Amino acid sequence: GTESGGAGLLEHCRAVQDWVDEIRRAHPDVMIENCSSGAMRADYAMLSRLDMQSTSDQADPSIYAAIAAGAGVAILPEQQGNWGYAQEEMDDETAVFTLTAGVLGRLYLSGFINRMGDRRLALVRDAVALHRRVLDEQGHLMPWWPDDLPDFNGPWLAYGLRHNHAIAEAVYPDVAALMDGNEHVEYLAVWRRGGVDSMYLQLGHGAHVRQVFPDPGQPDHAPGARPWTVEHVDPDTVRLTVADSERPSARIFEISYRAQ
């Protein structure tokens, strides 16, 4: 009898997965990405076998922000291949906006690096340095949406990585022990694509919020992207206000909680 199209597709997928398994056995140290036509085939049969997953082929930084902010719903942070494609001709805010998308996942750094001047190259280096710091901690951090799950068309997006004590205790007991008696650090990326110039976030009691990208200590790396204002409205709530309300912008913050 004639097999169904679905049965044929299933056998094809299994054959591809068997082939990937053979490659992993032969080359266990090779890192393999699942591009899958811009993440249109990001199923866990493949994600369980491959190291990284491209989250999109989207080239508009404003749209990509929503993809990067929501990817953690289905893909582990350490697998999220989020593109950051700063270009020399971009203004500072746009360059920061696109680089922010990659820092908390796996930064897919694109753009013509060889055409960049010293200032733009310094900004890219800052993003890469922060990304490497995040990578060291990703294994015991989990996705976090302090303003609920992102609205694909929403004016503000917020996505972060935070410690989960129960997971750390089960998988990284040494990390859990450090969390019990010491200050611990979490990360938050915020994009403002339009609308009002401030966002209120419930971050919990004792949250200390500090902008880390672009680095306020290196203002010459992105002089057109001035630091956002951080105000504590009450012990649990922080208000973030953009520096320029006329165009989209993004920032990454480090949030620290000191043990009580």
Feature roles, as predicted:
Residues 2-12:
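Glycine-rich tight-turn/loop motif centered on a GG-T
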Residues 34-36, 113, 189-192, 201-203, ...:
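Active-site proximal loops enriched in glycine and acidic residues that flank catalytic Cys/His/Asp
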Residues 34-43, 117-121, 145-154:
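A glycine-rich phosphate-binding loop feature that marks nucleotide/adenosyl-phosphate handling sites
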Residues 204-222:
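Solvent-exposed beta-hairpin/edge-strand motifs
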Residues 101-106, 110-149:
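Aromatic- and carboxylate-lined catalytic core of secreted/periplasmic carbohydrate-active enzymes
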Residues 10-115:
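Glycan-recognition surfaces
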Residues 150-207, 247-254:
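Carbohydrate-binding surface patches
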Residues 225-260:
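C-terminal beta-strand-rich structural cap/linker in extracellular carbohydrate-active enzymes
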